[in-house]
Amino acid sequence: MKLFDVYSLLDMEPVRGEGAYLWDKNGVEYLDFYGGHAVISIGHTHPHYVAKISEQLSKIGFYSNAVINSLQVELAEKLGPLTGYPDYELFLCNSGAEANENAVKLASFTTGRARVLAMHGAFHGRTSMAVALSDNPAIQAPANKTANVTFI
């Protein structure tokens, strides 16, 4: 089996990261302006991050959100005051695409409307609804074109 060809790959294989820097398999150092889809913006191998992840993995790596998870409750309680929206409800997702798709679904449930406005040239992820909201025919399958999306 081989990997699905989603993107044209750059001829560079990072094997190590520290702070804002990456090293490839040939030892070439790069200043990393990417940050992994904005999920590692504190830098690579940050000691606090590594310690907290290691601590959690030594207890349990993952479990369903269908059971009580005090860490999720603690996160919600901390995010409220930090964001200025303490009365909001937190809905945790695995990816930006999943967050975008669920935001559209929640808006539709709330308003009863089906039509969605999306920006020309925007990219929202690779789940079905996120692709439908992305104005890029190269990634849209016929099934993605059934959504009620108007591009502005």
Feature-to-residue mapping (PLM):
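N-terminal glycine-rich, Lys/His-bearing helix-loop that initiates the first secondary-structure elements
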Residues: M1-Y88
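PLP-dependent aspartate aminotransferase-fold enzymes
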Residues: E77-I152
